[in-house]
Swiss-Prot record:
May form a complex with LTO1. The complex LTO1:YAE1 may function as a target specific adapter that probably recruits apo-RPLI1 to the cytosolic iron-sulfur protein assembly (CIA) complex machinery. May be required for biogenesis of the large ribosomal subunit and initiation of translation. One of its GO terms (biological process) is protein maturation. This is Protein YAE1. One of its GO terms (cellular component) is nucleus. Keywords: Cytoplasm, Nucleus. The lineage of its organism: Eukaryota, Fungi, Dikarya, Ascomycota, Pezizomycotina.
Amino acid sequence: MNALGDVSPHTGPTQLAAGHAPPTPPHEDPLDDIYGSAPGSPSLLGVDPLNLDHPRERTHEILSDLPSRQRALDTDAYREGLSNSKGQYVQEGFDEGYSLGANLGIRVGYILGVLQGFVAAWRGSNDNLFKDTKKVYDTAQKELAIQELLSQQWVTEEGIWNWEVHGVEDDPTFREVAEQHPVVRKWTATVESMAAQWGVDLQAVEKVHGSNEEEQS
């Protein structure tokens, strides 16, 4: 078992060690550190609040009805949402738990940034989807609060996380620990499902951030 201050944590419970200097907070381009690859985990939501199981043809029909001006605004909305979320949530995570908290902040900022883009995309185009997406975003904000992710439900007073982590190598990275937080997995799967149903290409977003996020692990 490694401490949260260690560079490469072991799978399972880990003790927070005192006296370790925190890592340098993320900086540079506001969009650099908010993009990231998401784990291919199954959705943990029992009920899909957006009813995303409607036919793909219907989804494409809805999106094709969006005026070209709105589509242009959508692109700006995704970028603005991702940019605005980055600094806030990474800093909150950094303040709460150094390396692990900062990596959780990266994932939270990414998820909420994409959801902000969805909300902006439907505003003025489809009132029902706008309201439903806004509700999803509001719920995500509450469940993904850094204080909630690092609460005693998930991390003990001694700094031990209690969710199972599987790394590519023997010692998983903090990025892997953060990605496999049950609440993060749930919302990552939700965002991926929404993007797939609405034809939003998150792969392009993920590629931009992949190498930079690796440096934060």
